[in-house]
Structure formats: C-alpha cells, structure tokens
C-alpha cells in the first residue's frame, strides 16, 4: 500500500509541478502580451500626440500667414486710397482754377495738339458758360496763324467730365478732360507719390 501511496503521491506531486510550470508560463505569456499591448498603445499615443502637434503648428502657421496677408492687403488698400485721394485732389485743384487760368489752359492745350482746326470742343455743362464766342474767335485766329483751319467750335453736346475738354471730329475724340490728364500722369507720378507719402 505504501508503494501505491508513494506512486500516487509522486503522480500528484508531478502533476502539481507541471500545473505550476504551465501556470508560470501562462502568466509569463500573459505579461508579455500585456507589455506588448502597452507598448503599442504608448506608441499610438505618441503618434497621435505628434500628429496633433503638427496639425496645431500647421494651423497656427496658416492663421499667422493669413493674418499677415490681411494686414498687408489692408496696408496696400490704405496706401492706394491715399494715392487716389492725391489724384482726386489734383482734379479738384484743376477744377478750381481761376477763369483766366482755365481758359489759358484750354487754349494752350488745344494749340499744342496736332489737329486740323475744324473739331468740336465738348465740355461739361458747368464749363459751357466759361467759353464764349470771343474765346473761340481768338483760338481760331491762332490756329489760322499756324496754318490750320479756323473752324473750331463749341459742341452742343455736353459730357459728364470734371473740367477740361474733349475734342471731337468724325467719331474720333481727343480726351483732355482733367480726369484723363491726371490719369495719364498717374503711372509716371505714382512712384514719386508713394515715396513722398510713405518713406
């Protein structure tokens, strides 16, 4: 009986050792699996954090860039408004020329043009009363003295211009309105005005 008990005891002891060994290996494998999952989770967390940081940085850079662009555009807009104001004021000063200076301007401008002398002078409704028949006669005499026709006349047509004149003949116009004259000088003078205003 003692042999049987010894054998049974040995079998139970071996079974317990085998069970402990299996439990130990299972526990070790469980720990390895848990460690691997934790490592993967930490790596994923770091990647998410890094991606979020990059996206936040990109978004911040975009916001800063857009803000700089808006500020630059606002500055350019303000500068352009000031430049436009300078040219608008030039037109206003020309509009406010005394009568004699205004008529001299028209006379000298017309005499400096390469015209035949039989054109029509178109002016604004406000300037129609400034140009009388004696002015036209004087102008025609000067044209005749230059070897041109002396048939210049005031047109019955008015134009919505801010001063100056438009010469018209056979569908062709020479625009010497104050706005056109100031605009023609704009490209030439704009850089000088920018330097004077903003440097």
From Swiss-Prot:
Transmembrane segments: none annotated. GO terms for cellular component: proton-transporting two-sector ATPase complex, catalytic domain. Produces ATP from ADP in the presence of a proton gradient across the membrane. One of its GO terms (biological process) is proton motive force-driven plasma membrane ATP synthesis. Belongs to the V-ATPase E subunit family. GO terms for molecular function: ATP binding; proton-transporting ATP synthase activity, rotational mechanism; proton-transporting ATPase activity, rotational mechanism. SUPFAM superfamilies: F1F0 ATP synthase subunit B, membrane domain, V-type ATPase subunit E-like. The gene is atpE. This is V-type ATP synthase subunit E. Keywords: ATP synthesis, Hydrogen ion transport, Ion transport, Transport. HAMAP family: ATP_synth_E_arch (MF_00311). It holds the Pfam family vATP-synt_E. It comes from the Bacteria.
